[in-house]
Amino acid sequence: KINGENVVGYGFHSNGRYAVSELLKKRFIPRLNEAEEKDLINDEGTNFSPEKIWKVLMQNEKPGGHGERSTAVGTIDMAVWDLVSKIEQVPLYEYLANKYGNGKFTNKIFVYAAGGYYYPGKDIPMLLDEMKSYLDLGFTTVKMKIGGAPLKEDLKRIESVLKLVGDGNNLCVDANGRFDIETAIEYGQAMEPYNLKWYEEAGDPLDYELNSELSKSYKNPLATGENLFSMQDSRNLIRYGGMRKETDWLQFDCSLSYGLVEYLKTLKMMDEYNWSSTRVIPHGGHQLSCNIAAGLNLGGNEIYPSLFQPFGGFPDS
């Protein structure tokens, strides 16, 4: 309690996922309930310890197999960090900067508006209306989906949005991992003249060879990583995926990948491979990533202004 009031930490997992309620109720929350206080509290006895709680959650878990459990742990982890910062009575981004960063934080980060999904009957004018609504909110960079229509039609969609946003650096495209290598390269060759901000998740996120081959033929920025759920998978992307530290973007989502405790390990790994944290723009559009970006010098954050409510609504104010 603070000043007699109960303090509650809130956590939720990322967009576009099935709920992990059963994993939470039957596997992870019971471990917390059964843990001794010393295994949950920091050594000073002044606050909860995210690292200790994470260790309790992961006890007896085998390595590898980073699937739905990573999201369940990430959901609890988010609530823990929210609780910790409230007990400290400082914004989470400030707490992260002071404890895990260089003490420097910012109140302003780069944010882009994601959307541009395919829907039955959604034509190019409707796509443009959606993108214009994001520009009207003050966003300068937007993202749209590709791969759900034939290449020729997708190119028309892209060119229409480019006329609206004015420059390729203001537009990202996302294939959601749907392409094989031939299609990924074909799209890349067709889109290269547009000089887009990035070409996202062309193929399966674990197909590092595909990503590496694409990087040899597509000279503009690539982006991927939202569906890599551990430090080890993220490291394999950097080792084998052909990602270029000067131009490409990493999109690891802390909520999907065991939470911020694991994310800190991923950021440390990146530093060991001479990757700047500014090359990370997390997937998901949730407030934890926003605080991480502001407190640990990431490159920005994703937001879904009109989707995934209520969680997509936090930029409203």
PLM features: residue spans?
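Metal- or metallocofactor-binding catalytic centers and their adjacent structured scaffolds
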Residues: 2-87
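Generic secondary-structure signature for well-ordered alpha-helical cores
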Residues: 4, 29, 33, 37, ...
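Conserved, mostly hydrophobic/aromatic
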Residues: 6, 76, 89, 142, ...
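Flexible, glycine/charged-enriched surface loops at secondary-structure junctions
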Residues: 40, 95, 145, 198-202, ...
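Generic detector of well-ordered alpha-helical packing
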Residues: 78, 83, 144-146, 175-176, ...
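Metal-dependent enolase-superfamily TIM-barrel catalytic cores that perform enediolate-based chemistry
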Residues: 98-218
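Shared catalytic-loop signature of beta/alpha-barrel
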Residues: 189, 206-317
